[in-house]
Structure formats: C-alpha cells, structure tokens
Amino acid sequence: MAFSVSSLMALVVISSSPVSSMSCDLPASLDLRKQETLRVLHQMETISPPSCLKHRTDFRFPQEQLDGRQFPEAQATSVLQEMLQQIVSLFHTERSSAAWNTTLLDRLLAGLHQQLEDLNTCLDEQTGEEESALGTVGPTLAVKRYFRRIRLYLTEKKYSDCAWEIVRVDIMRSFSSSANLQGRLGMKDGDLGSP
C-alpha cells in the first residue's frame, strides 16, 4: 500500500509541474516533416536542372543571419515560421499550380501547413513572445527580402519553367540549410552558447 501512495505522489508531482518549463518538443517531428518536404520538392523536378543553368541567379539566402547561434528558442521558432509562411505563399498561387504536378504541390503545401501548425503551437507555449519579435526583426526581414527577390525573378522571367526550376532548387537548398535554425529548437536555454 505504501508503494501505491508513493507512486501516486510521484505522478501528482510530475503531472502538476508547469508546462511552460518544458521545452517545445519539435525537433523530431520537424526533422521528419522537413525530410518529407525535401523529398516532395525533389520529386517536383520537371526539367533537368543543368538545362536551366543559364537562368541561375543568387537570391542571397541570409544563411549568416539564420545560423541559429544568435537566437533563443522562441526567436528561432519565429524566424523558421516566417520562412515556412513565405514558402507556402510562393507555392500557393495560380501560377505555381500551372507549373507543377498538382498532386505533388498539394502534398508539399499540406506538409508545410502541418509544420506551421506545429510551430504555432510551439510559439503559443513559449514565453517572451514580445521580446522574441523584437529580436527577430533583422532575420525576419532578411527572409522576407530573400523571398521578395525570388518573386521578382519569377516575374522578370515570366514564370517560365526554367525560372520555377531554379526557384525550386534554391528553396530546397535554403530549406535544407535551415537545419541549424531548426536545431536551435532542440536546445535548452542553457545551451545557447554551445556550438
């Protein structure tokens, strides 16, 4: 009987600990969804990338600003959320629907929406959102500028198949290189200075 009471007490203590003290548990689910997103983006290839080499351009993805070492967890979440929203916005257009296989495009958008839902849940759990918003103005603005350059490029190239292919490859590269930022979501506040 004493064992049951002590077990019950342990459960009460564990279940009554504040949720806000727990880190947002996204890394495993985000990594799986990120891999699926990259797989779908790869499957969306319609033109051999080498045939579009003359159309290449540097959209200047702000890797230095997004390396993750500069941000606490809430800020990394906020910047990653902006990046996902921009990708959804880019691919959720009539012109995008005309350029891509709609089944793959729907899978891509569904996966991105799921990641956004996960990040929104995480942001809701985190404290200091006002502080994080102030700290991410520069990186968030850099992400917005990156996507603005992509949109201008597509407009200049009249949404050609090669232009979309160049954008698809660059989105894959930038999404893949955001791993450091996503890795920040798995670190506790005490780990912020860790490499």
UniProtKB/Swiss-Prot annotation:
Q: Give a GO cellular-component term.
A: extracellular space
Fetch the Gene3D superfamilies from UniProt.
Answer: 1.20.1250.10
Spell out the InterPro entries in the cross-references.
4_helix_cytokine-like_core, Interferon_alpha/beta/delta
Q: Which Pfam families match?
A: Interferon
Q: What SUPFAM superfamilies does this protein's entry cite?
A: 4-helical cytokines
This chain belongs to which protein, by name?
A: Interferon omega-1
Q: Which UniProt keywords apply?
A: Antiviral defense, Cytokine, Disulfide bond, Glycoprotein, Secreted, Signal
Broad class of where this protein is predominantly found: secreted
| Keyword Cell membrane appears in the UniProt entry | no
Species: Equus caballus
Drop me one GO molecular function for this one.
Answer: cytokine activity
Instruction: Give me the disulphide-bonded residues.
Output: C24-C122, C52-C162
Keyword Secreted recorded: yes
Family indicated by similarity: Belongs to the alpha/beta interferon family.
